[in-house]
């Protein structure tokens, strides 16, 4: 189910609500390891403890926990925040896209994404890597980068679905 919200072990299978919590867990552990406040051999135990704290679930096997991502095993530290930055940037862009294209939702309901892809081409893709991300967001949206549009999106979407 596309809009179902529930805690799960695997980051890449997480819903929109929990995905960034998965990222937060990883970032917190990276900061501790890089800051020499946590030793690598202690990671599995700390992972499981934090996972229980954040998701209220017990990790029973490492493949559902600390070993599910390849990032750390290939030395890709500091990469996880880019996923959340992408979500936050998407929130900014989607908010502006909806303002600029009142019929956007109607197109999506019909399976037509051409309005969105045209908007992205005109406002993002044509610039390539000419601008720093924050500058590109400001240029495309007229506003500074913020998490507010993404949080509003989650609130609006899931408040309606779950009647909260």
Predicted regions and their residues:
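Cation-handling catalytic/transport regions enriched in His/Asp/Glu
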Residues: 1-164
